[in-house]
């Protein structure tokens, strides 16, 4: 835009269980964009740097291994610590309210993001209320809302890092 920057969420990959793994995510990205882009950046939750009991690699090591062809020295845009929830909530709300030089555009095709941004609620502590629900088929419990909006938060707080830092100080 003339007076600022547009941040556009033009696609999403919200893979259902049992395909909601780092490997399957990378495969889906490669299938859709592998022959159409020269480089990629990745953003996300700081917990992706931690090893799980399921794998010898962290989620981000899997991403780096599988997307190596499209990555360069500056591709990893993840943080070692997540931005504070309340600060990032207020910063994102300021963007939506037009109080910053940034503008967030979410394509209607990003259905999970639209649903998440529409229905996520605030808990009594000012954080995101991560309602737990149980999948009727698998029996697994998961958070109904919050993952898509968290991913947007992490990306925006990193892309707009200097503005976010000033906001937090201010």
Where do the language-model regions lie?
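Mg2+-dependent endonuclease catalytic cores in nucleic-acid-processing enzymes, primarily RNase H-like
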Residues: 3-137, 162-163, 170
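Acidic, Mg2+-coordinating catalytic module of metal-dependent nucleases/exonucleases
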Residues: 138-168
């Amino acid at each position: 835009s003339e007076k600022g920057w547009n941040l556009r969420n033009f696609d999403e990959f919200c893979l259902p269980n049992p395909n909601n793994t780092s490997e399957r995510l990378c495969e889906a990205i490669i299938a859709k964009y592998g022959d159409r882009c020269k480089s990629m950046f990745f953003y996300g939750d700081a917990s992706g740097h931690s090893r799980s009991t399921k794998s010898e690699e962290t989620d981000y090591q899997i991403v780096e291994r599988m997307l190596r062809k499209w990555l360069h020295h500056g591709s990893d845009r993840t943080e070692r610590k997540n931005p504070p929830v309340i600060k990032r909530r207020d910063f994102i709300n300021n963007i939506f309210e037009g109080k910053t030089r940034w503008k967030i555009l979410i394509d209607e095709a990003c259905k999970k993001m639209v649903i998440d941004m529409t229905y996520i609620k605030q808990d009594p502590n000012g954080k995101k209320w991560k309602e737990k629900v149980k999948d009727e088929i698998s029996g697994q419990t998961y958070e109904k809302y919050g993952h898509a909006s968290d991913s947007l938060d992490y990306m925006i707080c990193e892309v707009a890092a200097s503005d976010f830092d000033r906001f937090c100080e201010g």
